[in-house]
Curated annotation (Swiss-Prot):
Protein role: Component of the ubiquinol-cytochrome c reductase complex (complex III or cytochrome b-c1 complex) that is part of the mitochondrial respiratory chain. The b-c1 complex mediates electron transfer from ubiquinol to cytochrome c. Contributes to the generation of a proton gradient across the mitochondrial membrane that is then used for ATP synthesis.
Cofactor (UniProt): heme b
Organism classification: Eukaryota, Metazoa, Chordata, Craniata, Vertebrata
Keywords, comma-separated and alphabetical: Electron transport, Heme, Iron, Membrane, Metal-binding, Mitochondrion, Mitochondrion inner membrane, Respiratory chain, Transmembrane, Transmembrane helix, Transport, Ubiquinone
Subcellular location: Mitochondrion inner membrane
Organism: Artibeus hartii (Little fruit-eating bat)
Predominant location: mitochondrion
Cofactor note: Binds 2 heme b groups non-covalently.
Entry protein name: Cytochrome b
Record keyword Flavoprotein present: no
PROSITE patterns: CYTB_CTER, CYTB_NTER
Miscellaneous comment in the UniProt entry for this protein: Heme 1 (or BL or b562) is low-potential and absorbs at about 562 nm, and heme 2 (or BH or b566) is high-potential and absorbs at about 566 nm.
Family: Belongs to the cytochrome b family.
Keyword Metal-binding included in the entry's annotation: yes
CDD domains the UniProt entry points to: cytochrome_b_C, Cytochrome_b_N
């Protein structure tokens, strides 16, 4: 009799995705981050649902409801800090996952790549709205600052901002709708993940060499299930250590001050995972130009497949491109650091230089280097 996992209508979908899925035999640990992101999403949805049971999306009660969760709810402090630091782990895995895709040329699977970019935008929107919910100083002023950027859109900008706010400033209506969307978006993300996997399983996984691996495939289970479990254990250990030993390491102390529209914090900044984009935004003196640069800093990923000029898919055997890739990583770290600094000399010029370099490396240097490598290899 045929095994039930191969005949049952529901189980055979799971079987073809996680058990009998043919996978390249050469996948390195850089291929672990997809499954780690799945775990992160699961942790965020679970902790988020339990937090939502005790949270109140009202400007007068939001801050106190978070305090109540931490002090009075059984293990509420654990839920709150798992959720807050889980977001940081989510973005660490996301950026490493995207970096892996860039390094090994996974972006040539354009459908999977484009759904991935949509996922990145959706997760960023979710995280931004989640940061507003505790209604501390940085929550309120971050929401005011970032939503106000939309006023740079010609003609409809001001009306659009007031429509998003639900009034003439960030207030009760804004908090309520942000809570509603923050609850809804992770489920949309989960649906997009299914589409992402659907497109990935149409083509099969890429591998470190970038060479088609059809003649040398192995079943996903037990080889990669065991490998993924090791990844889960390492990540959950790191997350637990962060939550239990220094839960506020990645947060902002200003968010422990209740939101006050009359007092502006000395330095408004988003969470660390948005600092690189925030630095690019601040590098341009013009408001509309800054907003466009901010959007393009992520949207530029969509044109990476068009800019691929190399005859090889992966960077594994392309040392010149590797140097540029790691320069890009260094530029991103620099931008993240600058985003957290005040707007003064020398930070302004460093931020502007790093922003220009970021776009130059992706748009000009990488395609030209690939052409040069082709020439050197007489291709």
């Amino acid at each position: 009799m045929t095994n039930i996992r191969k005949t049952h209508p529901l189980l055979k979908i799971v079987n073809s995705s996680f058990v009998d899925l043919p996978a390249p035999s050469s996948l390195s640990s850089w291929w672990n981050f997809g499954s780690l992101l799945g775990i992160c999403l699961g942790v965020q949805i679970l902790t988020g649902v339990f937090l939502a049971m005790h949270y109140t999306s009202d400007t007068a009660k939001a801050f106190n409801s978070v305090t109540h969760i931490c002090r009075d709810v059984n293990y509420g402090w654990l839920l709150r800090y798992l959720h807050a630091n889980g977001a940081s782990m989510f973005f660490i895995c996301l950026y490493l996952h995207v970096g892996r895709g860039l390094y090994y040329g996974s972006y040539t699977y354009t459908e999977t790549w484009n759904i991935g970019i949509l996922l990145l935008f959706a997760v960023m929107a979710t995280a931004f709205m989640g940061y507003v919910l505790p209604w501390g100083q940085m929550s309120f002023w971050g929401a005011t600052d970032i939503t106000n950027l939309l006023s740079a859109i010609p003609y409809i900008g001001t009306d659009l901002v007031q429509w998003i706010w639900g009034g003439f400033s960030v207030d009760k209506a804004t908090l309520t709708r942000f809570f509603a969307f923050h609850f809804l978006l992770p489920f949309i993300v989960a649906a997009l993940v299914m589409v992402h996997l659907l497109f990935l399983h149409e083509t099969g996984s890429n591998n470190p060499t970038g060479i088609p691996s059809d003649p040398d495939m192995i079943p996903f289970h037990p080889y990669y299930t065991i490998k993924d479990i090791l990844g889960f254990l390492i990540m959950l250990t790191a997350l637990s250590t962060l939550v239990l030993f220094s839960p506020d390491l990645l947060g902002d102390p200003d968010n422990y001050i209740p939101a006050n529209p009359l007092i502006t914090p000395p330095h408004i900044k988003p969470e660390w995972y948005f600092l690189f984009a925030y630095a690019i935004l601040r590098s341009i003196p013009n408001k509309l130009g800054g907003v466009l640069a901010l959007v393009m800093s992520i949207l530029i990923l969509a044109i990476v497949p068009i800019l691929h000029t190399s005859k090889q898919r992966s960077m594994m055997f392309r040392p010149l491109s590797q140097c540029l890739f790691w320069l890009l990583v260094a530029v991103l770290f620099t931008l993240t650091w600058i985003g957290g600094q005040p707007v003064e000399h020398p930070y302004i010029i460093i931020g502007q230089t790093a922003s220009v370099l970021y776009f130059l490396i992706i748009l000009i240097f990488m395609p030209l280097t690939s052409i040069m490598e082709n020439y050197l290899l007489k291709w």
